[in-house]
Amino acid sequence: MTFLAIDVGNTRLKWAMYDAPKPGAAVLAHGAEFLDHIERLADSAWAGLPAPTRMLGCVVAGDAVRRRVMEQMEWWDVPSHWVVPSAEEAGLVNGYDHPTRLGSDRWVAMIGARHRLLRQGPARPLVVVMVGTAVTVEAIDAEGRFLGGLILPGHGIMLRALESGTAGLHVPTGEVKLFPTNTSDALTSGGTYAIAGAVERMVQHVIQHCGEEPACMMTGGAGWKMAPSMTRPFDLIENLIFEGLLAIAAERFR
């Protein structure tokens, strides 16, 4: 039974074909496409793939983009399933005031992180950071309850906001420095430390609430840029959303 996982973010669609809908399944093929080029999938990346038996995806880019993805899947004749956050799924309890309003990417990534944590050892609190166009910082207690999370602009959005709202800041991308001595480095360092500070504050909240140090995981396309600037060790995971989709699929499609 083959399984297609799809993650439709704000700028790109990422996909992976697995040999089974369960954690630990082998990857048969994978790829990514910018949202502007979704219509290429059926005739290019997906053209030589066998029809998946099952499909599960999450989308944050809106219904119009989701419909475009479904059109590319029509020739496979496989039912499409999309994650909508609920009160509880795959061992994670949703603490959001209105569970269905939580971003599906956040929900799926947290499920992936929780399952990865339990495979590694005993349950403990968890902080999950997803670094992309936007940055999310989630807190989960040892019992598997999502306590709440932060949303803040990603590094690119911060820089564009400063460039558009401030005269004279159209400068090349700089480096992260302890004591920046030019505008490029000051902008890059400021954005990086703003994100790192939000993460550190959430970690402290979890310690105060749960009474113990949380495990810390980071994912997302820009995670590798942030990891060296964190004040504590983070496990850098390539794609927690795919891991979450596999965990959900194992329960839904068994």
Curated annotation (Swiss-Prot):
It comes from Paracidovorax citrulli (strain AAC00-1) (Acidovorax citrulli). Belongs to the type III pantothenate kinase family. Catalyzes the phosphorylation of pantothenate (Pan), the first step in CoA biosynthesis. Its cofactor is NH4(+); K(+). The active site is at 105 (proton acceptor). It catalyses: (R)-pantothenate + ATP = (R)-4'-phosphopantothenate + ADP + H(+). NCBIfam families: baf (TIGR00671). Substrate binds at residues 96, 103-106, 183. Its EC number is 2.7.1.33. It is found in: Cytoplasm. One of its GO terms (molecular function) is pantothenate kinase activity. This is Type III pantothenate kinase. One of its GO terms (biological process) is coenzyme A biosynthetic process. HAMAP family: Pantothen_kinase_3.
